[in-house]
């Protein structure tokens, strides 16, 4: 696979290689192969949000930092759960009701709603919307270089851009986010909980 990607770059069909959904050890192997092939590799795309912190547990985030490779986070708002969209129930025009492929009604449990409300309160205390805080949190340490957001309205894009105005978090804020997001999950070694 790395050979095919290198071939695409060397033939001029692509400028750089980007990978998707690798864990830390696999990223390290891929980077070594691409380096040997003298092929520029710059980015890895993975799902990442306050509710899905797999890249912290599988070593990808630490490996990307060590190798100085970027990460593009997709689904940073957890399919809309990390917005104010579902705070008062499931709207009829919501993704859950109209599509259901990526976000199912069963995902919005009472326990999840409690977490969303806790995070919403924390965001309000920071002077941000929940979506702004969720995006700011992803960008807080400079390891994730970009986020992919889906917007159904232009104003959602403008609101999401506001996230970059406040990417600083106190230790207490990070601890609270960790406490909410790691309920029933295995903690990574760098957790503050």
Feature roles, as predicted:
Residues 183-189:
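Conserved small/polar residues in nucleotide/adenosyl-binding loops
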Residues 1-178:
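Beta/alpha (TIM)-barrel catalytic core signal, keyed to glycine-rich beta->alpha loops juxtaposed to Asp/Glu
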């Amino acid at each position: 696979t790395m050979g095919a990607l290198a071939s695409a770059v060397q033939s001029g069909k692509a400028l750089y290689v980007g990978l998707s959904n690798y864990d830390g050890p696999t990223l390290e192997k891929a980077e070594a192969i691409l380096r040997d092939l003298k092929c520029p590799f710059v980015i890895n795309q993975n799902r990442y949000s306050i509710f899905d912190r797999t890249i912290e547990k599988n070593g990808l985030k630490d490996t990307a930092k060590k190798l100085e490779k970027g990460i593009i986070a997709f689904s940073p708002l957890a399919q809309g759960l990390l917005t104010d969209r579902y705070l008062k129930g499931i709207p009829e025009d919501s993704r859950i009701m109209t599509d259901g492929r990526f976000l199912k009604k069963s995902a919005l449990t009472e326990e999840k709603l409690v977490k969303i409300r806790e995070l919403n309160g924390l965001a309000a205390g920071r002077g941000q919307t929940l979506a702004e805080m969720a995006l700011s949190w992803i960008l807080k340490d400079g390891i994730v270089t970009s986020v992919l957001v889906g917007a159904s309205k232009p104003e959602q894009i403008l609101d999401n851009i506001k996230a970059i105005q406040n990417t600083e978090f106190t230790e207490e804020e990070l601890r609270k986010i960790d406490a909410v997001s790691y309920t029933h999950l295995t903690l990574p070694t760098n957790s503050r909980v």
